């Protein structure tokens, strides 16, 4: 839900295997979830097949048909150790709500330190900049902590001129000690103890698994009006079908 009076609303979503696996009905369903936000950040856009970029274009087209005016950008494939690991990122935004300041870019300085280097974009609203790093970490058993440490160092070294918003799928929780460097610089997670991934099957009526998707922001430069994980599953009977959309919940934040 987006409240009145906010400055900007952002939603981040790891949409599993976002490409030809998503039919028109699924694209329409995704659009119905993200349509009320100003900026949409997507992880796991398929890189090895043009259908990944085409899926982003299809989603933007569906959003435009819903009444607002939207634009989008898609990253190049990440500079990953293998083509199986490489992905694209995407941003989609409401053009009457925010403007894109310049061409987004993969952060080359982090390409040797992260399996999938983050995708940077600066959006502006009412003369305030929002410098977004869109990121998908390596799996939890392959040391995503070292990637987060590299991201933290990059943000801290460049924080004077930037209003960093770090978002995505980090494959670690907000309580991992690797975040302490950012927390010491007044960065905070938008969600706490909020599970954001889906189990393969319900367990005693429970289908949420681990809290690894989040949005990190500077509380010196921003005030959070609201943050949430959007549960599009709602009940166990829907789990199998909804996992075809994604095995992650989207996470959102409204900033003053």
Positions of predicted regions on the chain:
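N-terminal, active-site-proximal structural segment of metallo-dependent hydrolase catalytic domains
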Residues: 1-88, 145, 149, 239, ...
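Active-site metal-binding loops of divalent metal-dependent hydrolases
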Residues: 15, 44-45, 137, 169-171
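Extracytoplasmic mature domains of secreted/periplasmic and thylakoid-lumen proteins
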Residues: 75-119, 123-124
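Surface-exposed patches in mature extracellular/periplasmic domains of secreted proteins
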Residues: 42-44, 66-77, 103, 162-169, ...
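Beta-strand-turn-beta hairpins that frame and shape the catalytic cleft
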Residues: 2-10, 95-100, 113-137, 255-256
């Amino acid at each position: 839900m987006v409240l009145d009076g906010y400055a900007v609303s952002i939603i981040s979503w790891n949409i599993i295997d976002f490409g030809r696996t998503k039919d028109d009905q699924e694209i329409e369903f995704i659009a119905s979830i993200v349509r009320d936000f100003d900026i949409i950040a997507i992880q796991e856009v398929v890189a090895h097949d043009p259908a990944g970029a085409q899926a982003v274009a299809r989603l933007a087209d569906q959003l435009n048909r819903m009444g607002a005016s939207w634009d989008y950008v898609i990253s190049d494939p990440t500079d990953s150790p293998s083509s199986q690991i490489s992905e694209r990122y995407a941003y989609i935004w409401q053009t009457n709500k925010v403007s894109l300041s310049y061409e987004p870019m993969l952060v080359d300085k982090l390409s040797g330190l992260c399996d999938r280097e983050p995708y940077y974009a600066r959006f502006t609203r009412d003369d305030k900049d929002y410098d977004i790093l869109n990121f998908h970490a390596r799996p939890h058993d392959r040391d995503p902590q070292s990637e987060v440490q590299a991201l933290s160092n990059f943000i801290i070294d460049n924080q004077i001129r930037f209003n960093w918003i770090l978002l995505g799928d980090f494959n670690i929780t907000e309580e991992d000690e690797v975040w302490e460097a950012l927390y010491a610089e007044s960065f905070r997670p938008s969600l706490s103890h909020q599970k954001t991934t889906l189990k393969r099957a319900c367990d005693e009526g429970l289908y949420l698994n681990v809290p690894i998707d989040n949005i990190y922001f500077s509380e010196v430069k921003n005030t959070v009006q609201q943050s949430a994980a959007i549960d599009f599953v709602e009940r166990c009977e829907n789990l199998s079908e909804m996992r075809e959309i994604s095995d992650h919940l989207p996470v959102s934040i409204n900033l003053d």
